[in-house]
């Protein structure tokens, strides 16, 4: 059995296969997931697991150099945005790098998900709780 935080085999395999500049999306329960992209559905019930819990576990396993967030989160879900940006600052400190944060429209965000290696669906039921993580290299 693995000793690290992430126990989900499908998600663990996916993170291990993500190469430099490739992306992984973590989303709320409502984001449409294109049929052409692998779906890793973790949602059990409303709020379980949460977006922030899932982000924390994934970023403990994945080196991140860039993120994309929907602009609409600023107005519609500022609490999640604040917590997300705080987690990213902590991740920068842990990784020793600066993470580029880019805001785009929700429509553009959905188009970007088409290029993700996989989309991880959480049980989060708050608006615009979505992020695209782009892999960096730890060397």
Curated annotation (Swiss-Prot):
* InterPro entries named in the record: D-ribose_pyranase (IPR023064), RbsD-like_sf (IPR023750), RbsD_FucU (IPR007721)
- Give EC number(s), comma-separated: 5.4.99.62
MF terms from GO for this chain are: D-ribose pyranase activity; intramolecular lyase activity; monosaccharide binding
Instruction: Locate the active site.
Output: 20
| Primary location group | cytoplasm
Gene3D superfamilies, alphabetized: RbsD-like domain
Metabolic or biological pathway, per its Swiss-Prot or TrEMBL entry: Carbohydrate metabolism; D-ribose degradation; D-ribose 5-phosphate from beta-D-ribopyranose: step 1/2
Task: Indicate the family of this protein.
Answer: Belongs to the RbsD / FucU family. RbsD subfamily.
Protein's name in the database? D-ribose pyranase
Q: What is the lineage of its organism?
A: Bacteria, Pseudomonadati, Pseudomonadota, Gammaproteobacteria, Pasteurellales
Q: What interactions and quaternary structure are annotated?
A: Homodecamer.
Q: Which NCBIfam families match?
A: PRK11797.1
- Which species is the source of this protein? Haemophilus influenzae (strain PittEE)
Question: What exactly does this protein do?
Answer: Catalyzes the interconversion of beta-pyran and beta-furan forms of D-ribose.
């Amino acid at each position: 059995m693995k000793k690290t935080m992430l126990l989900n085999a499908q998600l663990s395999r996916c993170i291990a296969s993500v190469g430099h500049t490739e992306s992984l999306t973590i989303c709320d329960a409502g984001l449409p997931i294109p049929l052409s992209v692998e779906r890793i559905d973790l949602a059990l019930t409303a709020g379980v697991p949460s977006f922030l819990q899932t982000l924390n576990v994934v970023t403990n396993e994945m080196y991140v150099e860039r993120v994309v967030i929907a602009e609409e989160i600023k107005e519609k879900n500022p609490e999640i945005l604040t917590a997300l940006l705080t987690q990213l600052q902590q991740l920068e400190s842990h990784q020793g790098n600066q993470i580029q944060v880019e805001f785009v429209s929700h429509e553009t965000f959905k188009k970007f998900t088409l290029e993700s290696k996989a989309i991880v669906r959480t049980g989060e039921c708050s608006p615009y709780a979505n992020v695209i993580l782009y892999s960096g290299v730890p060397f």
